[in-house]
């Protein structure tokens, strides 16, 4: 398996780039190929996907995007093509926040992801993408408001983070706060 390829970008297409290293041109499927420039030396973090009939090299700008991609393809029914469409269109923090807050509607905006797939992603990955510590940058507006209210009531960040993992933020803010409190009072 290749961990990364460092070389000169020699070709850019809508689906891939070609990175030349020591006279060998590697065709690398990229979620956002136009972030690279022809003639620029770059390091592409890679994943080699092996099927019985094909070897495909996927490339990403950073480890964080690669790690999210790998988590997504571990979900039943989500292949590399669907995972690429997810990481191509948005910031990884927004995607992680949507998964952690059970925002299936947000995930359905990506090509090839319907409600059933979005719910499967949430079911398989919720709680596995962030630490137990609360990361305010990853939270949606509703979850930030609930977190602030719980903090004002004297709960620590670890307790808040654990409760927010189980709250449905598609509902009204007051109901979400009540749900978080009910979880904390168990």
Curated annotation (Swiss-Prot):
<feature type="region of interest" description="Domain III">
    <location>
        <begin position="138"/>
        <end position="186"/>
    </location>
</feature>
<dbReference type="InterPro" id="IPR003583">
    <property type="entry name" value="Hlx-hairpin-Hlx_DNA-bd_motif"/>
</dbReference>
<dbReference type="InterPro" id="IPR000085">
    <property type="entry name" value="RuvA"/>
</dbReference>
<dbReference type="Pfam" id="PF14520">
    <property type="entry name" value="HHH_5"/>
</dbReference>
<dbReference type="GO" id="GO:0009379">
    <property type="term" value="C:Holliday junction helicase complex"/>
</dbReference>
<dbReference type="InterPro" id="IPR012340">
    <property type="entry name" value="NA-bd_OB-fold"/>
</dbReference>
<dbReference type="InterPro" id="IPR036267">
    <property type="entry name" value="RuvA_C_sf"/>
</dbReference>
<dbReference type="GO" id="GO:0006310">
    <property type="term" value="P:DNA recombination"/>
</dbReference>
<comment type="subunit">
    <text>Homotetramer. Forms an RuvA(8)-RuvB(12)-Holliday junction (HJ) complex. HJ DNA is sandwiched between 2 RuvA tetramers; dsDNA enters through RuvA and exits via RuvB. An RuvB hexamer assembles on each DNA strand where it exits the tetramer. Each RuvB hexamer is contacted by two RuvA subunits (via domain III) on 2 adjacent RuvB subunits; this complex drives branch migration. In the full resolvosome a probable DNA-RuvA(4)-RuvB(12)-RuvC(2) complex forms which resolves the HJ.</text>
</comment>
<keyword id="KW-0963">Cytoplasm</keyword>
<comment type="function">
    <text>The RuvA-RuvB-RuvC complex processes Holliday junction (HJ) DNA during genetic recombination and DNA repair, while the RuvA-RuvB complex plays an important role in the rescue of blocked DNA replication forks via replication fork reversal (RFR). RuvA specifically binds to HJ cruciform DNA, conferring on it an open structure. The RuvB hexamer acts as an ATP-dependent pump, pulling dsDNA into and through the RuvAB complex. HJ branch migration allows RuvC to scan DNA until it finds its consensus sequence, where it cleaves and resolves the cruciform DNA.</text>
</comment>
<dbReference type="InterPro" id="IPR010994">
    <property type="entry name" value="RuvA_2-like"/>
</dbReference>
<comment type="similarity">
    <text>Belongs to the RuvA family.</text>
</comment>
<keyword id="KW-0227">DNA damage</keyword>
<dbReference type="GO" id="GO:0005524">
    <property type="term" value="F:ATP binding"/>
</dbReference>
<protein>
    <recommendedName>
        <fullName>Holliday junction branch migration complex subunit RuvA</fullName>
    </recommendedName>
</protein>
<dbReference type="Pfam" id="PF07499">
    <property type="entry name" value="RuvA_C"/>
</dbReference>
<dbReference type="GO" id="GO:0009378">
    <property type="term" value="F:four-way junction helicase activity"/>
</dbReference>
<dbReference type="InterPro" id="IPR013849">
    <property type="entry name" value="DNA_helicase_Holl-junc_RuvA_I"/>
</dbReference>
<dbReference type="GO" id="GO:0000400">
    <property type="term" value="F:four-way junction DNA binding"/>
</dbReference>
<dbReference type="GO" id="GO:0006281">
    <property type="term" value="P:DNA repair"/>
</dbReference>
<keyword id="KW-0238">DNA-binding</keyword>
<feature type="region of interest" description="Domain II">
    <location>
        <begin position="62"/>
        <end position="134"/>
    </location>
</feature>
<keyword id="KW-0233">DNA recombination</keyword>
<keyword id="KW-0234">DNA repair</keyword>
<dbReference type="InterPro" id="IPR011114">
    <property type="entry name" value="RuvA_C"/>
</dbReference>
<feature type="region of interest" description="Domain I">
    <location>
        <begin position="1"/>
        <end position="61"/>
    </location>
</feature>
<dbReference type="GO" id="GO:0005737">
    <property type="term" value="C:cytoplasm"/>
</dbReference>
<dbReference type="Pfam" id="PF01330">
    <property type="entry name" value="RuvA_N"/>
</dbReference>
<feature type="region of interest" description="Flexible linker">
    <location>
        <begin position="134"/>
        <end position="137"/>
    </location>
</feature>
<dbReference type="GO" id="GO:0048476">
    <property type="term" value="C:Holliday junction resolvase complex"/>
</dbReference>
